[in-house]
């Protein structure tokens, strides 16, 4: 079709049903013109100009979306889907960020009128109708008492199962900074005090806080009374802000200061993983009090948003995302590849709603966290990629989606969802332009977050205009404040030159300094006099700084060689994670030896496979800053088992002479640098399944495993009778009540049947073992040519658990020797126990030594009721570790994840196995040692670990 412009447009009316009246062309023209004027007023509210053409409609687009989620008196949960009232999540941040302070105030006031005032205190009543998974949803109980904000404005009568208070009051604290409205602060103070008391009463655990559905991604998150990073961060910020606000209006700040200090200290002591440099997801309250060390991205960015950490810690904490969070490439046929990617929120399994998703708001707030940590390039790359994916590549042009097309289970969802609109607003003003108003003190902090290759940018809002221009030797910032009172600007500006000639504000030179802990590049700090119009000029001398490499791969036994620009002197080292050999304790700086304190560019690192970061203080022309060094430490030999041969690839820069040992076989090998070799291993030294091999070279011992289930076993089998240890029939795993130990506190936790979550507390899975049991002959059943003995019928599994229903460990006596033990296992796990050890099988020898198999979700410990998922992105399991499974109902053997048909449990899983499945695992053992026993141990909470059979390969 072709079109040509018409000088006189035709106006068309589209109406549902019969029109109430006939409109003339003039009427329609007037209606259209009024609407068009309103549209232009709205789109011109946020005027953005950048060198990136993809972004220049972002401001107008954002204004329209933000207007779409407003319906007086409050912001809504979504513009189209979920167009309903809820006092959170992050949608309302858009109001103050985009200068709609009247809307913000109306939103806060109407929900303040929804705060419950009585009773002051009420008992904890966990909901027995929902199998103790959550608190009773009833007014007048512990959660729904004084301080709780109800879901509808101007209405205190409706309980709702989320702690939306936390984010609601976080938005309110920001509102006071954005407006400086002390009268409104005084009015809201009692409301805020009630909230703080409510949080402590319900969720305080020691000096930290539990999380009771307190963030968008909270469906199926349940911490069982544990100590949680993201809510502790929210409460830290709340107490810090309450202390500051108390001083302004003459209230007592001391209780809030003390609480904030206690939270900070406890977070550092209990949740900060010092040798890894990031915060854990949570710490269990019960059992082994495990620190769960694979956090969701919300644990990382909420810490940044509360400004808890110093610059070094903040950099390290964000590095967790770089090192460990699944990244999914954003690619579109025909589009230039700009290495855009999006993040999954976790790498946890099995999937359930909001446990492991690809969500726009989550990605945008992670980008904001990078900006808050001064990691501008990382911030921009993540931000831009996700905006492009949502606004250009998705189902609706200009959309702010909830979930992305790249979400493995749900795909793209919703148009203009409030949560990402609120976060997107903050990323524009606080992130890219770096503007943080604090009008309570008549100050504005500005920390520009522009990419290094931008030479201009401009943003106009009702509150302020901001223009950035850069030439070869000068950077200029024009800032026009439209606030009522004059303001001072607190500037922190990253610079690309080591020599600064002058800093001027409105033509007058001002004092400035380099921020002491500048990371990645020097950052200059200064404060302007109070005013409304500011012209800031930074004039440079000398050469532009060369960007240094930050990411290095290092091979064990080889020095790490840095290739910094020769003009930079390395003055100091800070090694908080203990990566460098003989590194002093990381409390203080390390003063290096050497002429003029200059450090060698070569470092010897501790010989351990890991990722980590240390920092080097560099100096050029008298200007100092800190350069991060991110290392990925590997063994220099990479191995692959293919065609019954072990292929070894050397990454070393030196020749390697080594020795291979497996089950008494010793073979020598030589590999030239960056070459590969193949070693044939006689079949009689191998066994079906997992084989442990030791490679010894250059003073290194590297233990590797090869897995091959097609190898023919050599040797006889010895079936172990577990009859005296069986304590349950496997079909009964979800047919009982797991009631203790549980804390008597308000929390979200596993329902008493041992499956499900707080959103779906009544679900179960029918386990049926008839096929497996009928397949036995003389008590034995063969899988993979391995005989498994199940020599009892009424009970056929030995369960262990941290629940009181079963012992936490069981010991099975053994005699003789063997080279491998095969196990038929069945039990439960859930996403809150993902990426950690759930249980252990320990083989004990007569001489006191042991061999151990860790049962880890998702690598080898899979839930009885469903299969886990492997897509190489958000759901990643090493292919050779995916176990064989046995369908209990039919006795059919299959490779995990490969069934052609799965059934579903509504709201819980679409990967259910009809009747459930057991898992075949194996553990190589020392063939030269006398066996004493097998010990089965439950390590993590919630789970049931079961052994149905054990077979020794002699």
Identify the function of each model-found stretch:
Residues 1-82, 117, 174-177, 182-184, ...:
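Acidic/polar, glycine-enriched structural segments that form the non-catalytic walls/loops
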Residues 84-116, 190-193, 197, 222, ...:
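Active-site core of glycosidic bond-cleaving carbohydrate-active enzymes
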């Amino acid at each position: 079709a072709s079109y040509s412009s018409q000088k006189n447009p035709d106006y068309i009316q589209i109406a549902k049903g019969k029109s109430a009246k006939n409109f003339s062309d003039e009427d329609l023209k007037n209606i259209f013109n009024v609407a068009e004027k309103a549209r232009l007023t709205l789109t011109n509210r946020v005027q953005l100009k950048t060198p990136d053409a993809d972004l220049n409609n972002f401001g107008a687009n954002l204004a329209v979306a933000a207007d779409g989620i407003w319906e007086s008196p409050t912001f809504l949960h979504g513009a189209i889907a979920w167009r309903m009232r809820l006092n959170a999540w992050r949608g309302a941040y858009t109001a103050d960020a985009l200068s709609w302070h009247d809307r913000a105030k109306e939103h806060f006031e109407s929900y303040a009128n929804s705060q419950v005032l009585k009773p002051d205190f009420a008992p904890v009543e966990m909901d027995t109708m929902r199998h103790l998974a959550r608190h009773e949803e009833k007014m007048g109980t512990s959660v729904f008492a004084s301080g709780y904000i109800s879901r509808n404005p101007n209405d205190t009568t409706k309980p709702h199962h989320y702690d939306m208070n936390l984010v609601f009051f976080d938005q309110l604290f920001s509102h006071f900074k954005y407006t400086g409205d002390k009268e409104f602060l005084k009015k809201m103070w009692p409301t805020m005090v009630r909230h703080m008391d409510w949080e402590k009463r319900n969720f305080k655990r020691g000096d930290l806080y539990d999380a009771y559905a307190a963030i968008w991604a909270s469906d199926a998150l349940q911490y069982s009374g544990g100590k949680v990073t993201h809510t502790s961060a929210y409460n830290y910020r709340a107490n810090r802000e309450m202390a500051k606000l108390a001083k302004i209006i003459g209230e007592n700040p001391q209780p809030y200061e003390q609480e904030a200090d206690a939270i900070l200290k406890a977070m550092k002591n209990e949740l900060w993983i010092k040798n890894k440099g990031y915060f854990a997801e949570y710490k269990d309250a019960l059992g082994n009090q495990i620190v769960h060390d694979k956090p969701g991205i919300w644990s990382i960015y909420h810490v940044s948003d509360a400004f808890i950490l110093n610059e070094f810690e903040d950099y390290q904490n964000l590095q967790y995302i770089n090192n460990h969070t699944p990244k999914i490439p954003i690619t579109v046929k025909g589009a230039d590849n700009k290495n855009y990617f999006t993040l999954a929120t976790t790498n946890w399994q099995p999937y359930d709603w909001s446990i492991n998703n690809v969500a726009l708001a989550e990605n945008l707030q992670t980008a904001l966290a990078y900006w808050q940590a001064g990691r501008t390039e990382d911030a921009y790359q993540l931000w831009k990629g996700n905006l492009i994916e949502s606004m250009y590549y998705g189902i609706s042009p200009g959309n702010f989606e909830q979930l992305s097309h790249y979400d493995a289970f749900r795909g793209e969802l919703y148009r203009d969802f409030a949560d990402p609109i609120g976060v997107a607003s903050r990323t524009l003003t606080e992130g890219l332009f770096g503007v943080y108003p604090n009008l309570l003190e008549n100050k504005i902090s500005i920390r520009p977050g522009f990419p290094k290759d931008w030479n201009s940018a401009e943003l106009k809002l009702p509150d302020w205009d901001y223009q950035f221009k850069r030439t070869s030797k000068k950077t200029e910032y024009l800032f026009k404040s439209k606030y009522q009172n004059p303001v001072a600007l607190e500037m922190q500006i990253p610079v690309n030159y080591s020599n600064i000639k002058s800093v001027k504000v409105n033509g007058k030179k001002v004092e400035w300094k380099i921020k002491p802990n500048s990371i990645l590049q020097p950052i200059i700090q200064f404060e302007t006099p109070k005013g409304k119009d500011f012209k800031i000029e930074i004039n440079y001398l000398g050469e532009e700084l060369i960007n240094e490499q930050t990411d290095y791969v290092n091979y064990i036994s080889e020095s790490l060689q840095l290739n910094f620009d020769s003009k930079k002197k390395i003055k100091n080292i800070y090694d908080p994670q203990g990566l460098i050999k003989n590194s002093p304790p990381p409390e203080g700086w390390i003063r290096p030896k050497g002429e003029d304190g200059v450090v060698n560019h070569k470092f010897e690192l501790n010989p351990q496979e890991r990722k980590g970061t240390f920092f080097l203080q560099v100096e050029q022309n008298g200007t100092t800053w800190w350069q991060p060094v991110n290392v990925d430490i590997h063994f220099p030999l990479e191995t692959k088992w293919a065609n019954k041969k072990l292929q070894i690839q050397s990454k070393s820069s030196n020749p390697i002479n080594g020795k291979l040992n497996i089950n008494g076989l010793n073979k020598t090998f030589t590999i030239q640098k960056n070459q590969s070799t193949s070693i044939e291993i006689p079949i009689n030294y191998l066994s079906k399944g997992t084989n442990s091999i030791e490679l010894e070279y250059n003073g290194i011992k590297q233990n590797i495993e090869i897995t091959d289930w097609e190898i023919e076993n050599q040797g006889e089998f010895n079936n172990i009778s577990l009859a005296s240890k069986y304590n349950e029939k496997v079909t009964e795993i979800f047919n009982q009540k797991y009631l203790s130990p549980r804390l008597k506190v308000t929390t979200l936790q596993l329902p008493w049947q041992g499956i499900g979550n707080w959103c779906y507390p009544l679900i179960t899975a029918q386990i049926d073992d008839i096929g497996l049991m009928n397949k036995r002959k003389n008590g034995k059943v063969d899988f993979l040519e391995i005989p498994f003995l199940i020599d009892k019928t009424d009970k056929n599994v030995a369960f262990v658990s941290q629940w009181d229903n079963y012992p936490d460990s069981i010991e099975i006596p053994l005699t003789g020797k063997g080279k491998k033990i095969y196990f038929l296992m069945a039990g439960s796990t859930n996403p809150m126990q993902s990426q950690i050890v759930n249980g252990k099988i320990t083989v004990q020898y007569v001489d006191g030594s042991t061999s151990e198999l860790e049962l880890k979700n998702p690598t080898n410990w899979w839930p009885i009721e469903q299969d886990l998922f492997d897509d190489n992105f958000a759901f990643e399991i090493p292919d050779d570790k995916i176990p064989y499974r046995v369908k209990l109902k039919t006795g059919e053997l299959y490779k995990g994840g490969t069934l052609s048909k799965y059934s579903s449990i509504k709201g819980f899983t679409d990967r259910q196995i009809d009747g459930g499945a057991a898992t075949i695992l194996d553990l190589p053992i020392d063939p030269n040692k006398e066996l004493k026993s097998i010990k089965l141990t439950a390590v993590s909470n919630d789970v049931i670990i079961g052994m149905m059979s054990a077979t020794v390969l002699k």
